[in-house]
Amino acid sequence: EDSVRMIADAKKEGMDITAEVTPHHFTLTEDAITEDDANYKMNPPLRTRKDVDKLIEGLKSGVIDCIATDHAPHHKTEKERGFVDAPFGITGLETSVALTITELVKKGVLTPLQMAERMSYTPAKIIGIDKGTLLPGKAADITIIDPDMEYVIDSNTFASKGHNTPFDGKKVSGQVRYTIVSGKVVYSNNNGTEVIIDKDVPKL
C-alpha cells in the first residue's frame, strides 16, 4: 500500500521511475499461507487484502507500469526444507498469462489491450528492446491466447524445470494456444494437447 502511494507521488513530481507487480502479488494474500508450505514463500512476501487492492488499483490507474513474472524456479527438494529454510521465489512464467486474464481482465480491471501493454509493450520499451508490438517490420515474437479457454493449473505439466507454485489446482481462464518466435511456431496447444515444436528457439 505504501509503495504504491510513494510511486504515485514520485511520478507526480516528475521523477523517472517505473514499477512492476507480479500475478502472485495481485492474486494472493497472506491468508493463503495456512501451513508450512514454502511454495508461498516469495520476496516481497504476501501482504493483506488491502495491500492487494492497492496493487490492483495501481495497475488500473497506470501508476504501476508492468506485470512481471518474477520467475524464480527452485528444485523440489529446496522447497521441501520448510517455510523458514527454503529459498524465496516461485515458478511464475507459465501461470502469469492465465492469472492476469482470470484476476484482472475477466474482472474488468484491465482490457485485453491494457494487459498486452503491461506484459509486453511497456516492459520492452522500459528496457530498450525493439519488441512488444505487432507493427510491420517488427520482430514476429507473438503469443496467441484463447482468453475463454478454462483449465486447471497442474505443475506436473510445466515445461520449466521448476515446479514450485502456490497455484497448483487453481482453475483459470486464458490458455496459450501458440507461441511464435522470429516468425516460427515453437509451441502449440490444440484442445489440451501440448506440443513443444522446437526447444532450440532463437535467443530473444
Residue ranges and their predicted role:
Residues G82-D85, A139-P202:
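C-terminal cap of metal-dependent C-N hydrolases
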Residues E1-I67:
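Histidine/acidic residue-rich metal-binding segments in metalloenzymes
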Residues E20, D70, T100, G183:
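Residue-level signal for inorganic ion chemistry
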Residues K12, I33-D36, R81, K106-V109, ...:
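Short, glycine- and charge-enriched coil/turn segments that flank and shape catalytic ligand pockets
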Residues F26, K76, V152:
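Conserved protein kinase catalytic core
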Residues Y40-K50, G89-T91, T165-K171:
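A short acidic, glycine-rich active-site loop
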